[in-house]
A protein has these predicted regions:
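Short phosphate-coordinating micro-motif centered on Lys-Gly-acidic
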Residues: 1, 85-87, 93-150
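The conserved Walker
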Residues: 34
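Conserved lysine of the Walker
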Residues: 38
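Short beta-strand-centered segment that lines the nucleotide-binding/catalytic pocket of NTP-utilizing
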Residues: 51-66
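Phosphate-binding P-loop
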Residues: 18-25
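N-terminal pre-Walker A segment at the start of P-loop NTPase domains
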Residues: 1-17
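Hydrophobic anchor at the beta1->P-loop junction of P-loop NTPases
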Residues: 28-30
Length: 150
């Protein structure tokens, strides 16, 4: 699935739509350059899950846990991870194989420990189409999501 957005609000809204469709136990990987809108998208996912607290990138903490929504939301940013042992120290498997949903930024750095069934989300800019243009590509096991028309 490919979604084009033309403003941060549209990127947020698409994230919210994903969050509304998310099911317990799903693991999403989120790929995109710095400043592409990963945090805005993630904030939308959180709102779609009914999370009421502020959502920010966990760059320095590796994981932020949110429990105020309809299911737990675990937001990982593994950009600064030194090695897989750091993931083991935080008990990643409890999150990846639990009843909440995980969204993992920079997941390519920990590919060897990702579950087999993931949903990959890539956000790309194209300045020729406008400063706020984003191409959001969702691939993987889309049948996990109850996709509906907007």
């Amino acid at each position: 699935m490919i979604k084009e957005t033309f403003s941060p609000e549209e990127t947020f809204a698409f994230g919210k739509w994903i969050g509304e469709k998310a099911l317990p136990g799903q693991v999403y990987t989120l790929v995109g350059d710095l400043g592409v809108g990963k945090t805005v998208f993630t904030q939308g996912v959180a709102e779609g899950l009914g999370i009421t607290e502020p959502v920010n990138s966990p760059t320095f903490t590796i994981i932020q846990e949110y429990e105020s929504g309809r299911m737990p939301f675990y937001h990982f940013d593994v950009y600064r991870i030194g090695d897989i042992e750091e993931m083991e120290e935080i008990g990643y498997d409890d999150y990846f194989y639990g009843n909440g949903i995980c969204l993992i930024e920079w997941a390519n750095l920990i590919e060897e420990i990702l579950p087999e069934q993931i949903i990959e989300i890539t956000i790309e800019k194209n300045l020729e189409k406008g400063f706020d243009y984003r191409k959001i590509t969702v691939t993987g096991l889309l049948e996990q999501i109850k996709w509906q028309k907007n």
